[in-house]
Amino acid sequence: MLKEKLQDYHIILASGSPRRQQFFKDLNIEFEIRLKPVEENFPKHLKAAEITDFLAELKADAFEGELNTGDILITSDTIVWHEGSALGKPADAAQALEMIKSLCGKTHEVITSVSFRTPDKKKTVNSTTRVSFSELSNEEIQYYINEYRPFDKAGAYGIQEWIGLIGIDHIEGSYFNVVGLPTNLVYKTLLEFTD
C-alpha cells in the first residue's frame, strides 16, 4: 500500500488549490504545502498536453536545489483545450462568460499534468478527459459566474459546482481530473516512483 511506502518520504505539494489539497487528504497522503510564484507562460508552438507538461515542470523547476533526500515534490497544471486553444483561468466576469459560452453545446478536453521530483529523479504524467456541455442560457451562465466566482478555474467552471450539475451532458475519462487532479494516475505513479 502507498501509505506504508510513503513513510520514508516527505511529500511537498506545490499547489494552492483547495481541491487538490483535499484530494491528497482523501488519498490519506500526508503532505506539506509549499508555494512559489511562477509566471505561467509557455511557448506558443506547444499544444494540448505539451502545455500542461511544460507548466507542471516549470513549477517544479522553481524548487531546483531546494529538495532534500526523501522529498517528493508534486506540481501540476490544468487547462481546458477547446478548438485548438488553451483556456486558462478567466481574468474577469466578461472573460468567464465568453469562455463558458464557447463551451456550450460542444465537447472540450480537460488536461492535467502532474510532475513528480526528487533530488535525483523526475517524472511527468498527464490525463485527458473529454467533457460535453449542454446549451446554457446567458442568464444561467451569468448566475453561475455571480454566485460561484470561477476565476480560479481553468475554462471558468467547476464540474463539481452548480454549472456542472446542470450543464455537463457527459464525460469520457476521469471526473477527478476535471476537478483538478487525476487521483488514480497520481496514486499509481507514486507507487511506481517510490519503488
What are the functions of these language-model segments?
Residues 22-26, 43, 66:
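Short loop/helix-cap segments at secondary-structure boundaries that form the rim of catalytic
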Residues 19, 38, 182:
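A generic "binding-loop/recognition-motif" signal
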Residues 16, 36, 119:
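Cofactor-binding loop segments of dinucleotide-utilizing enzymes, especially the Rossmann-like FAD-
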Residues 2-12, 46-195:
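Anionic-ligand binding patches
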Residues 2-29:
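N-terminal beta1-alpha1 ligand-phosphate binding loop
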